[in-house]
Amino acid sequence: MAFTSAVITFPGSNCDRDMAVAIEQVCGGTVHRVWHGDADLPEGLDFIALPGGFSYGDYLRSGAMAARSPVMQAVVRAAERGVTVLGVCNGFQVLTEAGLLPGALMRNAGIRFVCRDVKLTVENNQSLFTAGYDAGQQITIPVAHHDGNYFADDATLDRIEGEGRVAFRYAEEVNGSARNIAGVLNDRGNVLGMMPHPERMIEAAHGGSDGRALFESVVRGLVEA
């Protein structure tokens, strides 16, 4: 079975090529490049990725306008059918604005853009995205964001913690995120949003390969299982 994926590009996306290259190199198969104005997605998709960037210039709120793009209606329908969806950085913001993930991403504490490698702890390795890691494993993945401060009310935080839906946690305070949450799963486990950029860490020659296992986990879970 060939792996078929799509990378969504919004006006202002700037990590869409990086995401497509990572998927091509690690997962193989066919990677479709899909424009925000497309009302439909290609048939037979296994995986959809929403990349980082500054969609629509982050006007109104980060991800708010992109979440109302024609293509996002198709992405929401696909996610509800069980298609695997990954949102990274701005993609995470879009997923929360579209209602596919709980919480919101706010301006970083300190009102500063954060761009550096950070340590993450793998909180849940039982998901499709994280099965290639060990529970409690520390990995190094870069961040680059101004609005990555994850917020949810206490009841929501308690619920997602109790349901094992925190996929990744910052090993130390990075941007003010509630409980240092860096990545969150939906209740079905087929949608992951995370602020750090795993697609930038797939080759040791480029500074590290800790992000590679995420893509390997996805293709193994969807194709090789």
From Swiss-Prot:
GO biological process: 'de novo' IMP biosynthetic process
CDD domains linked: GATase1_FGAR_AT
Pfam families membership: GATase_5
InterPro entries: Class_I_gatase-like (IPR029062), PRibForGlyAmidine_synth_PurQ (IPR010075)
GO cellular component: cytoplasm
EC number(s) stated in the UniProt entry for this protein: 6.3.5.3, 3.5.1.2
Subcellular location: Cytoplasm
Stretches assigned to the Glutamine amidotransferase type-1 domain: 5-225
Gene3D superfamilies according to UniProt: 3.40.50.880
Pathway the protein takes part in: Purine metabolism; IMP biosynthesis via de novo pathway; 5-amino-1-(5-phospho-D-ribosyl)imidazole from N(2)-formyl-N(1)-(5-phospho-D-ribosyl)glycinamide: step 1/2
GO molecular function, one term: ATP binding
Role summary: Part of the phosphoribosylformylglycinamidine synthase complex involved in the purines biosynthetic pathway. Catalyzes the ATP-dependent conversion of formylglycinamide ribonucleotide (FGAR) and glutamine to yield formylglycinamidine ribonucleotide (FGAM) and glutamate. The FGAM synthase complex is composed of three subunits. PurQ produces an ammonia molecule by converting glutamine to glutamate. PurL transfers the ammonia molecule to FGAR to form FGAM in an ATP-dependent manner.
PANTHER family named among the record's database cross-references: PHOSPHORIBOSYLFORMYLGLYCINAMIDINE SYNTHASE SUBUNIT PURQ (PTHR47552:SF1)
HAMAP family in alphabetical order: PurQ
This protein's name: Phosphoribosylformylglycinamidine synthase subunit PurQ
Provenance organism: Novosphingobium aromaticivorans (strain ATCC 700278 / DSM 12444 / CCUG 56034 / CIP 105152 / NBRC 16084 / F199)
Gene from which this protein is expressed: purQ
